[in-house]
Amino acid sequence: MGNSHSSENGGNSGSGGGSGGGGSGYSGVSENMIIDLEGRYHIDYKNRNYKKLKPQMFSTFFEHYEIVQADSLINSDFIKNKTVKKNRDNSSNNNSNNNSNNNNNNNTLNNSTIITTTTTTTTTSTPTTTIMITPPQQQQQQRTSLDLTNRDISESSTPNEQQIRLAQEETENQEIVESSFLKSSPVPSPSSSVLKSFESDFQLNTDLTTETFDDNSAEKKRQQQQQQQQNEDSKQSSQQQTQKSKDKDESAKIVNNKSSSTTNIKPILAAAQTSRSTSIPAFNRNKTKEPTKQKIKKEHSTLRKNSLSSSNIITPNNTTNTNAKDGASYFNENSLMSVKSDIKIFSLDLSINRLENITNDILSIMARFEIQELTLSTNFFQIIPDLQLVKSLTTVNLTRNKLSKLQTSVFIELPSLTSLILDRNFISSIPDDIDQIKNLKYLSIKHNALEYLPNSLSNLSQLISLDLSQNKLKTLPPNFDDLINLRMVWLSYNQITSLPSMRKLVNLVTFDISSNKLLSLPKDFAYLVPSRIKQSYSDIDIDEYDENINTCNNINSNNNDSNNSNNNNNNNNDNNNNCNKNNILEMINSTELEGGGLGCLKELNIRDNRELISLPVEYKQVESLMTLVTSIPSEIIPGIFLGGLDSANNAPILQTLGITHILLAIGDCEPFFPKTFKYYSIDDARDAPQYDISQHFEQTNCFIESGRKSGGVLVHCRAGISRSSTLVISYLMKYQRMTFKQAMDLVQSKRPQIQPNPGFKDQLLKYEAKLFCTNILNISSHNSNNKNNNSSNNRKSINNRKSNNIIITINNSSNSNNNNSTDNSNNSSTSTTPNLSSLSSDSSSSASLSKLSISK
């Protein structure tokens, strides 16, 4: 669980502790990293391969923690590749501290320091240093002895002096080597003991003092005995020096002084060696004996200021202690209370591990952290843990576990629980006391084995979202509409055959009951959108709406040449306008009476209910005001249907609607029922603006027309939005003589979700211009043919000079006028045809007048 520290990122700047090496210089995962998610603190233990949670995993946060912004992390797990801009400053500070420590170690002979540092060469992988507190008497004796040795060494030149100098150089070289090793060596690995982490802490933090607890009396006695032996040795050496100086003559003082210096150095070196072997191995002896309990005293204010200025590491007041039995850090009640007032954790993620249970110790720590969101998904829980100990929980996620029962007793004791997610388990039933979770708002138990729902589920009056999809439900509770606050319901992929009353669900926004076995659909959903109907129709200009209706009604009307026929058409249009206004007002009044005006339904998904063949009439009134996702295709005009792929794979619905032809506008799809229906496929059809779909217009229009005459035709693509709608619009422009805007409005009124892509729209506009030009050319050609016929008739009338000549010419002119009127009536579909027909009629009348004059 520890971290591997590298020297490049300031690896020796942190101190190990707890279950993993902490510190600010690292590039991997930190055990004490807290992610700041917009003011909400998050701990991520996701995908760590944990089989059991231990208290020391969380006790590291009692010692120190580091708050990291989410934008400084690269991946979404919040645990890798943290930015380490601050590590350079820390590494430089640590290097300066190490240099100052080395200088202090070299100058201990001249400085009157209380703390003495010594080094040893041990067999461990990391060098060790200790901080000892010496009594004042021993310090004075050491100072006097060291001063004597310095003077004697400077005055002497014997082989003993050279040995002493060599010994000092060796010790200095050892210090240099060890200090350089400290600079380049990483922090102890996670496999090393907790004692080594404290040793590295002593190496890097020289201001710390070490005290021993009263429990370790044996160690105290040993240290006292060592100090007494050192004091006795120093006293004996001083007495020998005084006696030798008094006994010898003045003539031999120099020689005696030299000899005394050598003899005086020996006990000093011996004392130094004893001090190395007795005082320092307090940590080395711990390899064979039990380690001593130690407590590190830290200045809270200074450390917090330094941490906030340099690295975002925050150190609480009380740090962890080392356990002498197992060598692991533990926490006490005081540290927990201090952490509780220091920081609060909003969410904890323990997903994608191998957890089977959570002990009460861990749950009590979670309670002290006041965790609100707990994620335990993708583990091996067979029984829900005792989460009632964490009273602050608001969200619990137990997705992808091995739960077979829903133990509501655990969640009833959580007063703040609002969201419960139990997806992808093996739960077969919901207990009757589910309504005791009073504040539950979001409940998701999808992809389980539920077969029925208790009636008490309807008592969850605060429930907003309910997801029970992908189960084995066949019915819903009869009082299901008592859940008056429901806004989103997902019941897809079940076996539901009928629905209860839904009239009270006035706050419902989304209802998904796709992929079931519905036999009928209640009309209650149509009455859950009356408020939107009122609002939408109150903003509609009825006269403007009537103009659009008139354009559709006048599609198949013929333009008569006489003024009487025009007046009759205007009268008929006025009657149609009055009827349309009355229909709109009747629809608004009917919805006001039946609906109540409180619904807000936006989407109803009834797709893939193969037994559901028809919809109630009420849904026709609101199909443009809500998104109705269904497998039933939309009927644009009688005999022409528009839909998606789900409409084409339901043979019973197609046969019920009388469809015989299917136009398939998908490049990578084969016909579903080639033996039952007649297909026309566009193999390379792509929903892309650069694709030229206009090259198929002439052929598809002929196929649609033949299918409409034979019974019905379905035009579909994958979603029934772009490709299929483009083909239907082109057909309406060609055979129903509509403009692009008229055809687009008509199709969109029948199927609101259609939307041809911009490239297809441009192609339809070009096709409109092409059709307009061809119509004009056809009209002009008809007029020229009529003129030729009139001139030939005039020549015949001139040659006939009989008494009834006038009557014959009048009859011929009347016949020609009748022929022109019938031809023009067949071609009068565009806005320009009335003018052209009038011109042709005028020309024919003038020709007849000329005939009359000529005959006279």
Curated annotation (Swiss-Prot):
Probable phosphatase with dual specificity toward Ser/Thr and Tyr-containing proteins. Residues 155-165, 254-265, 272-281 have a biased composition (Polar residues). The gene is mpl3. The keyword Lipoprotein applies. Keywords: Hydrolase, Leucine-rich repeat, Lipoprotein, Myristate, Protein phosphatase, Repeat. GO terms for cellular component: cytoplasm. Pfam families: DSPc, LRR_1, LRR_4, LRR_8. LRR repeats lie at residues 344-365, 370-391, 392-413, 416-437, 439-461, 462-484, 485-506, 507-528. This is MAP kinase phosphatase with leucine-rich repeats protein 3. Residues 11-24 have a biased composition (Gly residues). Residues 1-10, 90-142, 178-195, 224-243, 306-323 have a biased composition (Low complexity). It comes from the Eukaryota. Belongs to the protein-tyrosine phosphatase family. Non-receptor class dual specificity subfamily. It is an enzyme of class 3 (hydrolase). InterPro entries: Dual-sp_phosphatase_cat-dom, Leu-rich_rpt, Leu-rich_rpt_4, Leu-rich_rpt_typical-subtyp, LRR_dom_sf, Prot-tyrosine_phosphatase-like, Tyr_Pase_AS, Tyr_Pase_cat. The active site is at 717 (phosphocysteine intermediate).
